[in-house]
Amino acid sequence: MEYTKSIAECIKAIEVVNCFGNDKSLINSVEYDSRKVRAYSYDDKTGLKKGAAFFALPGIHTDGKKFINSAIENGAVCIFYEGDLNNHSCDEICFVQVNDVRKTMSKVSALLYDEPSRTLGVIGVTGTEGKSSTVSFIFQLLNLCGKKAGFFSTVEYSIDGNVIPNPEHQTTPESNVVQLRLAQMRDSGCSYAVVEASSHGLSPKTARLEDVIFDAGVFMNVTQEHLEFHGTIEQYRYDKANLFRALDKNPGKGFPIFGIVNYEDPSAPYFMEATQKNVYPFSTELKDLKKIEEYKGLFAKDIEESSSGIKFTLCDFSSRKEYGCELKLAGIFNVKNILASVLAVQRITGLDIACIIEKLPLVKPVKGRMMLIDEGQDFEVLIDYAHTPSSFMTIFPSIKERIKKSGGKVISLFGSGGERDVKKRPEQGRIAALYSDIVILADEDPRGEDSVELLEMIAAGCPEKKRGEELFIIPDRPSAIKKAFSLAGKNDAVLLLGKGHENSIIFKDRTMPYDEETTARKLLIGADCTNP
């Protein structure tokens, strides 16, 4: 389906500093990458030229204004920019100067696609960890309960029932993609949209979610992460809470408006106070029981994990009933993700919670999240996206305890993202050393940093590990995984952490296609992994 809006119509909806050139054309797409601008054409009904609006976004490494000529050559009919514009003039093109080009791109994108979030029940999920799994679980439960939904997350997205791997490294895409995907969900008959709302996406610096009308906000947790972007943990938390502040701006669309918080996290009260709407908590800790009862939330008790999955009892303080629950998922932490998901689906649809709970055994794990790889080897291989100290503490203790009981050892392999928060690196090393018998450090996404220097910063956190026996630095990830498998024996566990679902490794001068699952499986069966 093609969407079009006149340039004049778009200009009326935004704050304009200056405008010159031809404003009679039609906009049929919004782009910030000049390479994606396609040749203009002419509208059959009006005869007017129609093409892309190019937004010259300011960036850390470059400025979008450098690509204006390229966008025009490729067929853009309108250029939006901020600041001064040098050596650009073309009578056939409309130039629009604005104060904030990112916010303007969000506004124009929403307008172009007829504000899709106005007709969808939109659930946003934020948190340092657990976002992608919770988004997927909400999406799955909605569809299992007969409520057509779409979603997008770090891992994958769906607009029409088909789940597609996310081609980007961004958790929350730029606003033009956000609005397009929401429009595609609406047009394919979806009633609900589940959105992974990262702190970057919720920050006014990016305005990626600026014009999304949220009906529900789900908060999972806040731990130290992305400080290279937010500056402080306080600002990081503040930006995440923008999801809950957005609930108060909802004009009312016929869906319930509410928040959900993980009451185990110390920041839960902060998020509850960020909105005037009802907020429902969940927890697995006895100390929170009174608060969960007071706010009519969900509580999980009698949690047991085995090789076949997880069992627990769910206490619903809204109906004051208890339900036995079964999950075919690994990782006790997934109980909290499921509590958030059940609560979100029940509150936004009004369905009987028992109908939702009976679908839980059908919920599937997310790619790259506690994924068990079995090629007949006598040791366990788990792939997980864990890449922060807090996520390490979520997965390591229970795995260590379980493997220790069987007499095995834990071998962990991971790295850390280049050009990102450096403070977490030695802490990653410390936690891994505490729970692992062998630590192997390998590339994650070194970007512009030297691989060995980066990995040595992690190694500084585990000085007690003997080099060459208990600690290895092997930048090439396939080679590092091969080493890990060579050291593994019966009843051992090899944890491949940090890449999860991602489809590449980013270096300074190149991006290498890479899939952790494919690489692991090839190495387990003895295949060549030179080009995984």
From Swiss-Prot:
<dbReference type="GO" id="GO:0009252">
    <property type="term" value="P:peptidoglycan biosynthetic process"/>
</dbReference>
<feature type="binding site">
    <location>
        <position position="198"/>
    </location>
    <ligand>
        <name>UDP-N-acetyl-alpha-D-muramoyl-L-alanyl-D-glutamate</name>
    </ligand>
</feature>
<comment type="function">
    <text>Catalyzes the addition of an amino acid to the nucleotide precursor UDP-N-acetylmuramoyl-L-alanyl-D-glutamate (UMAG) in the biosynthesis of bacterial cell-wall peptidoglycan.</text>
</comment>
<dbReference type="Pfam" id="PF08245">
    <property type="entry name" value="Mur_ligase_M"/>
</dbReference>
<comment type="pathway">
    <text>Cell wall biogenesis; peptidoglycan biosynthesis.</text>
</comment>
<dbReference type="InterPro" id="IPR035911">
    <property type="entry name" value="MurE/MurF_N"/>
</dbReference>
<dbReference type="GO" id="GO:0071555">
    <property type="term" value="P:cell wall organization"/>
</dbReference>
<keyword id="KW-0131">Cell cycle</keyword>
<keyword id="KW-0573">Peptidoglycan synthesis</keyword>
<dbReference type="InterPro" id="IPR036565">
    <property type="entry name" value="Mur-like_cat_sf"/>
</dbReference>
<keyword id="KW-0436">Ligase</keyword>
<comment type="similarity">
    <text>Belongs to the MurCDEF family. MurE subfamily.</text>
</comment>
<keyword id="KW-0067">ATP-binding</keyword>
<feature type="modified residue" description="N6-carboxylysine">
    <location>
        <position position="240"/>
    </location>
</feature>
<keyword id="KW-0132">Cell division</keyword>
<dbReference type="GO" id="GO:0051301">
    <property type="term" value="P:cell division"/>
</dbReference>
<feature type="binding site">
    <location>
        <position position="208"/>
    </location>
    <ligand>
        <name>UDP-N-acetyl-alpha-D-muramoyl-L-alanyl-D-glutamate</name>
    </ligand>
</feature>
<dbReference type="GO" id="GO:0005737">
    <property type="term" value="C:cytoplasm"/>
</dbReference>
<keyword id="KW-0547">Nucleotide-binding</keyword>
<dbReference type="InterPro" id="IPR013221">
    <property type="entry name" value="Mur_ligase_cen"/>
</dbReference>
<dbReference type="GO" id="GO:0005524">
    <property type="term" value="F:ATP binding"/>
</dbReference>
<dbReference type="InterPro" id="IPR005761">
    <property type="entry name" value="UDP-N-AcMur-Glu-dNH2Pim_ligase"/>
</dbReference>
<keyword id="KW-0133">Cell shape</keyword>
<dbReference type="InterPro" id="IPR000713">
    <property type="entry name" value="Mur_ligase_N"/>
</dbReference>
<dbReference type="GO" id="GO:0016881">
    <property type="term" value="F:acid-amino acid ligase activity"/>
</dbReference>
<dbReference type="Pfam" id="PF01225">
    <property type="entry name" value="Mur_ligase"/>
</dbReference>
<feature type="binding site">
    <location>
        <begin position="171"/>
        <end position="172"/>
    </location>
    <ligand>
        <name>UDP-N-acetyl-alpha-D-muramoyl-L-alanyl-D-glutamate</name>
    </ligand>
</feature>
<protein>
    <recommendedName>
        <fullName>UDP-N-acetylmuramyl-tripeptide synthetase</fullName>
        <ecNumber>6.3.2.-</ecNumber>
    </recommendedName>
</protein>
<dbReference type="InterPro" id="IPR036615">
    <property type="entry name" value="Mur_ligase_C_dom_sf"/>
</dbReference>
<feature type="binding site">
    <location>
        <position position="34"/>
    </location>
    <ligand>
        <name>UDP-N-acetyl-alpha-D-muramoyl-L-alanyl-D-glutamate</name>
    </ligand>
</feature>
<keyword id="KW-0963">Cytoplasm</keyword>
<feature type="binding site">
    <location>
        <begin position="127"/>
        <end position="133"/>
    </location>
    <ligand>
        <name>ATP</name>
    </ligand>
</feature>
<dbReference type="Pfam" id="PF02875">
    <property type="entry name" value="Mur_ligase_C"/>
</dbReference>
<dbReference type="GO" id="GO:0008360">
    <property type="term" value="P:regulation of cell shape"/>
</dbReference>
<keyword id="KW-0961">Cell wall biogenesis/degradation</keyword>
<dbReference type="GO" id="GO:0000287">
    <property type="term" value="F:magnesium ion binding"/>
</dbReference>
<dbReference type="InterPro" id="IPR004101">
    <property type="entry name" value="Mur_ligase_C"/>
</dbReference>
